[in-house]
């Protein structure tokens, strides 16, 4: 059975059974704005709970954008295995366009302890 949660993770993680989760897909706040919802979470607490609830071959897949990508990667460098690049169809950051390039991609970081099931996908040009 698949069970999805859409809530503040610190409300639900403590209530999830040990070793019962295959994957956590997270879109953490990147701390790139001054908005109240965009503040850095307690990554140490997150990894403690994630390690408790993930199955042995479970993984965490998380979106990020620099400079948060570096913060997230270093928060669990031991289990960081690889990164995907999410190429966006429309760049963002128009208000800062005179100061820096607009942001046309995000990072997707993949963390795990033991290799989960992986089905390679062949694509043209790769």
Protein language model regions, located:
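Core catalytic lobe of class I
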Residues: 1-126
């Amino acid at each position: 059975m698949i069970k999805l949660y859409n809530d503040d993770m610190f409300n639900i993680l403590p209530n999830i059974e040990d070793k019962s989760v295959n994957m956590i897909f997270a879109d953490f706040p990147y701390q790139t704005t001054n908005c109240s919802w965009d503040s850095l979470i307690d990554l140490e607490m997150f990894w403690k709970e994630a390690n408790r609830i993930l199955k042995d071959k479970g993984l965490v897949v998380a979106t990020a954008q620099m400079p948060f990508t570096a913060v997230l990667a270093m928060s669990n460098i031991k289990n960081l295995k690889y990164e995907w690049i999410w190429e966006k169809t429309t760049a963002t950051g128009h208000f800062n366009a005179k100061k820096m390039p607009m942001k046309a991609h995000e990072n997707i970081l993949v963390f795990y302890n033991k290799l989960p099931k992986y089905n390679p996908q062949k694509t043209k040009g790769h």
